[in-house]
Amino acid sequence: MASTEQWGAFLHQCLAHRIDVADFKNLSRLLFKRNPIAQGALIDVVLETRLAAGIKWDPLLPLYIDGLCKMGKLQISTVLAALLKHSSIHEKPGTDAAAAKQKQKCYTLMTDIRVIQDAMLAVSTGHAPKSLSETAGTFLAIADWIHAVVSWHHGQMNASQQAEGLMSSPDAVSLFESLGILLAAVSGTEKGLQVLSSDSNEGLKVKLGHALSAYLPLCVDLSLPLRNRLDALQKEFNLYGEPPPKNLGVSSLENLHVNGIQFEASIIDGPAINSRAGLYVYINAMLAGRPLVDDSMLLNYLTNRYGAHYDVLIQDLITAAFDVCSNAMYRNESSRTMFLFRSFLVNKLPSFFAAMLSASMVSIPMELCISHALSRLDPNTFPSFSQMFSMQGNTVLSDVRQEFLFACASHKLIPESSIERLLGENPMQALPVGYNKDDLVSQINTTPERAEQLINEIEFTEGNAGPIVGAITEVMQNLCNQKETMTLKNICNSLSRRPQALDVILLFRSPKQVLQPLCALLDSWHWDEDQGESQPVYDEFGSILLLVLVFKYRYDLSAYDLGIANNDSFVLRLLERGSSSQKLDELSESQNKHLGSWIGALFIAEGISEETMSACSPQEFYLLASTLFSQSLAACEAGKLEFETLKGGFEYLLEPFLLPSLVVALTWLGNHIWEAESDPSIPLKALHSLVSPSSISGEAKEIHRTVLNITARSLDEQLKDVRARHPSRTDIKPILDVLEPCLSFPRTGSCHRSELETWTTHAGNLLGSIRSTMQSLVLWCTSPDVNIPPPSYTHRQLVAGIRIVGATRLLAALLDELRLQTDANNGDLALDIAASLVCAPLPESFAVESSPYHPVAVDLAKDPVPRCPLLTLRDALALQHEAVPRTAEKDPARAEAVVRLYRRVAALAAPTAQVPNLDMNNLIQNMQLGVGVDGHDQMGLPAGGAGDAVGDEPNLDQMLDNAAAAAAAGIDSGVGQGMGGDMSGGLDTSIDDVLNAADMAVGNPEFLDLDMEGMF
């Protein structure tokens, strides 16, 4: 038998029997001695084995290739060249040949991505390339790969008007960006620099220049740091695909710059119009997903927008909040979304206005402002009580006007006697009793049970949510400082089962202010401090941790949002690696001992003993939960453990004091089922017994529902994928039915699949549908009827555009629409709407955009603002503005639109040096705008607890100086990872540690932005 045949048979057997990479390397050494093979032939055999299997993704294959590279049997350049030869990237859409070839060639992009990522790791750790020839070969292979991917992109664009090129395939985007990062990594090595600096490699540099020139225009939509790194590489080594141009001449560049300045100076701004749609868009954006409410940032935006015209500001803000509620009703938004909008109107706005009034140096006629705002509302949407009986339509908002007026009266904005005048009829309720935060804190300290009652009232729409939230968060912080974990447990349990209450909390507090004390307590939990029973301690620890997990997964929070600055934090380790199982030989001696004790307690002994728990801290148990599941399930699948015994042992985890551990365990189990190549019957039976237990205690039911809320979305996606591969299975649907009610738990601002399908089937695709939305907003503002309902709008559409097609293309569409509306004499209105869309808060960039408003509270050395994982509309606009001198020469009208929009956005987003006629120091002192845990000023909510400088308010001018300095320093931001899944079935996942921070694709949540400066 020939060497290639023997190696082919060997590889086929290894894949079929799921031989791990360590054993594969040992077996390969033996076969190399018996049947030596050239590296080109070897990699061909490896990749052809994939074709024989016909599997879209096998995680073992790239691990085998990486193992052969580490053994020195394969070079990266050879691997990349062969990988391209066998890749499905060559398939062209819409051709008969491609269809015929599809039968012979399997989909390879997932494997291609992983192999290239392994090459990135080898380069970044210094293991490759080992010679100048290998380096040159690697450069050539990367250039060929880039040309192939760009060609595929253009083929997709040409094949269908609805195709989005790269953006039509997350795998293609990941592959594209991986190639760029690999190129940057190789060019940063010593041998890479030698190759690029050598005059004897002109042919290579020309080819590489062609590839870079094709790559960079597409890269700008994906990763600005990567684009900047490769752009610098191109300029440094003159990689333009041709001999370097002759001296351009400094004078011509200077002339271009001067012409750009003169062009901008020639543009005269029109009147700044504050359209009704502008604030309508901004409020929608604040509440589209996680409530993005920062009082200082909002007040700054409103002050920039309205100046000293506070009566107009208040009137328009009230109108916008009612418009948002009206839109939600007509769009049939969920009751959860409708509740948040109502709570913002009734609970947030009155307290916000009260803060403004307390600091105002001028009289603001609140009753008149409210009257004018209410007169602009559609009476059919907000009917009076008497009209309800004659109306046939939806009366869900019939009592909102009354609730808002009573809340305003409760905050002393208007006298109670004016409610009847403003309503036009007798009110049907009495004025609610107003709360004081300090009184509520005293009540909870005296009677801890009062906290439960108040948490229930957070969801009331009586205007009292602000003081309640302030009291609850202050008490929680004090309890954390005092380590009074029993009372804290009860508060955390009460909050965990009320997701809507968490939404209201974020109207008044940032996530960091709520969660930083909890995470610090969990991280510093010393097991030897408590000498009592272990079960209550597990109970308290689990309840506190569960609330942190609820916040994290409901709102997709980053480590920065959670207030975690220590890389060795237990909470951070749990989120990043908790759902990844470990091999036994990777565990420490104490971990092996704890694991054995828990396995014995669950499956051998009569139950969990005090000795088992007292020997293992809660932190250690949670970090071992996935490994415990992995080992137990493996024993059952191997026939060493009866399923009923397995099921009985897992039922112990349904006890309240251990239930929160199912968050990490179910995440691991879902990944295991999704990855399984063998029959997943046993894991599915285990999963069904855990998500739908035959019996569970009353106390545990609420915790179990919370656990399902957290894990349902990922489990649902994984199980549906498994069902697609095994359509005949009948044991998946019952699990999906149990999970279905929990799928609406996340609140991240992501759109629904049905919404995306509607937008993408628009004649102009997603960008066309966004332009159509902008047109409807302009049309609404030009209507002479002030009572006309707002047009249908959800900010999820704009967020989807940024995440899917990228901010650069989306901004281009907005600029095109702005020019069109300008030609139709609606330019000033359209400019305000476009600027509002650009300024609207976005979850990914909220941390960096809000940080300048709290410079005193931010210690960038200890707690740096994270990097933003994507290019925002503001970033894209800034890049367009930099290019105005060149754009003005080719397309003056477009350059003018860029300049006007840039100016309007800059005016709306600029930190104000002083709010006219508002004494901000008085505002802070009277309205208790204390700097909280992370410095997010929240009106009406003093930040309590350690670290707050009571009575030591910062000077406003100093704050603004610091903010300007921070802005000049160019602070970046980003978003943290979720709980890391073991996506390779317990195999070597070292590459994931490098790539967890890498944003490998727009719209692909598996990867985040790579710190380019740190890597290169």
Curated annotation (Swiss-Prot):
What main location does UniProt list? nucleus
The processes (GO biological process) annotated in the record are: regulation of transcription by RNA polymerase II
Taxonomically, which superkingdom? Eukaryota
Q: Name one GO molecular function term.
A: transcription coregulator activity
Example GO CC term: the record gives: mediator complex
The question of whether Transcription is a record keyword is answered with yes
- What Pfam family is a match for this entry? Med5
The record's family statement is:
Belongs to the Mediator complex subunit 5 family.
What is the role of the protein in this entry?
Component of the Mediator complex, a coactivator involved in the regulated transcription of nearly all RNA polymerase II-dependent genes. Mediator functions as a bridge to convey information from gene-specific regulatory proteins to the basal RNA polymerase II transcription machinery. Mediator is recruited to promoters by direct interactions with regulatory proteins and serves as a scaffold for the assembly of a functional preinitiation complex with RNA polymerase II and the general transcription factors.
Q: State the protein's name.
A: Mediator of RNA polymerase II transcription subunit 5
Which organism's genome codes for this protein? Aspergillus terreus (strain NIH 2624 / FGSC A1156)
